[in-house]
Amino acid sequence: MFSKILVANRGEIAIRVMRACRELGIKSVAVYSEADKNALFTRYADEAYEIGKPAPSQSYLRIDRILEVAEKAGAEAIHPGYGFLAENPRLGEECEKQGIKLIGPKGSVIEAMGDKITSKKLMKKAGVPVIPGTDQGVSDPDEAARIADSIGYPVIIKASAGGGGIGMRAVYEEDELIRAMESTQSVAASAFGDPTVYIEKYLERPRHIEFQVMADESGNVIHLADRECSIQRRHQKLIEEAPSPIMTPELRERMGSAAVKAAEYIGYENAGTVEFLYSNGDFYFLEMNTRIQVEHPITEVITGVDLVKEQIRVASGEELRFTQKDINIRGHAIECRINAENPLADFAPNPGKITGYRSPGGIGVRVDSGVYMNYEIPPFYDSMISKLIVWGMDRQEAINRMKRALSEYIILGVKTTIPFHKAIMRNEAFRRGELHTHFVDEYRRGIDAEMRKIVKEDQEMVERLQSTFLPSKKVAAISAAIGTYMHSRRG
């Protein structure tokens, strides 16, 4: 087992990994940018080192600086979290050169699955269902028109190197095709440095269902059931739940077997997620995320498996401690991503200072966060404030518990997505489990109307509770005391 791990990330996921390290008796090392010098994760770590200016390109994406710190601190392994360098194959290559273990799959696997065309070809060879379309890049408009005609409109044009919903464009008629191709190629070149695009059949109302997989270095692979991620905006997830409301034992067997087959075929190691689109009884491979996912806590809650600790164990050379038969699902879990965004302004980012903060609690409630009262949310990174996770004996109890937890969650000073989540929990179609990836767009008018009502209700509640928030001088004193405590823990 490792004695010291460097966490090459920030915010809540950095703290999440550090907690796992602490439970395993492993020292943790934080790296941080100038903008994060007062961030909670830097104080939670046993050691912390500044690595550059606020821009990710000058800090969290600096492989050279991160490896310098790893060597200086004596870290034997690096956990990349999610985002930043988590799916950059070069990090693994550089770690290998320095004799440092990257907690994740091999660089060649990251590279193969990070390219949508390559991954689709591999999945076809593995016998995993894929969406009808091309399995090579398309640049000629005439060829694109022939392909679109053969598979039938609507089609979707995707960037081969894309991810996070960036570089995707649906096309409903041939007249739109050339313009859509040019636009997608331009976005792909700008965002990913690769203008290659491909074409697939566009599924208009699919569900987004993914399977968590875990594999060790001896070739043992299992799945830890499914997650439903259909509540999205601009192809980016907002709410996840486990298991999927439509999942049956038979469907889980089929989809889970396909996910395991995918991981086995590419020689996968560590934690990963195989994502599918589900439509009219059929499912199709979408992509594989070669890292821990933002939404991993809901899988932990329903299975009782600490995925991050298992990542560390597997990376240290241990075999999986359980088989597929050992994985049992208990109850239902929901996760709401609490972002510093204005949901009534098309989810525009809203960084700033948190002037009031009270997180929810009670049975079946978990908050993964990296913020605190008077914390300044920097504008340079993802807008996530926290992840609110609840568990219930069944889906209905989980929804009601989430409603209660959201009603307790108070964040002042910045606009957040809390009103959006409250509106979704009240939505009858959501409560019935009638989900698809265009749910938010379809019910937008009703959701917006409900949010406006909620914002007014929340404002009245906050005014009544203002006295519960401590004066800033007392907060500063408490923060200093917490800082002293955290530093004393490093000894």
From Swiss-Prot:
Gene3D superfamilies with a match to the protein in the record: ATP-grasp fold, B domain
Modulation of this protein's activity: Inhibited by ADP and alpha-ketoglutarate.
Active-site residues, as the UniProt record annotates them: 291
pH dependence: Optimum pH is 8.
Known cofactor(s): Mg(2+); Mn(2+); Co(2+)
UniProt EC number: 6.4.1.1
Comment on activity versus temperature: Optimum temperature is 60 degrees Celsius.
Location of the Biotin carboxylation domain: 1-445
Pathway: Carbohydrate biosynthesis; gluconeogenesis
The reaction(s) this protein catalyses: hydrogencarbonate + pyruvate + ATP = oxaloacetate + ADP + phosphate + H(+)
GO MF terms held by the record: ATP binding; metal ion binding; pyruvate carboxylase activity
Alphabetic keyword roster: ATP-binding, Gluconeogenesis, Ligase, Magnesium, Metal-binding, Multifunctional enzyme, Nucleotide-binding, Pyruvate
Role according to the record: Pyruvate carboxylase catalyzes a 2-step reaction, involving the ATP-dependent carboxylation of the covalently attached biotin in the first step and the transfer of the carboxyl group to pyruvate in the second.
Protein name: Pyruvate carboxylase subunit A
Gene name of the encoded protein: pycA
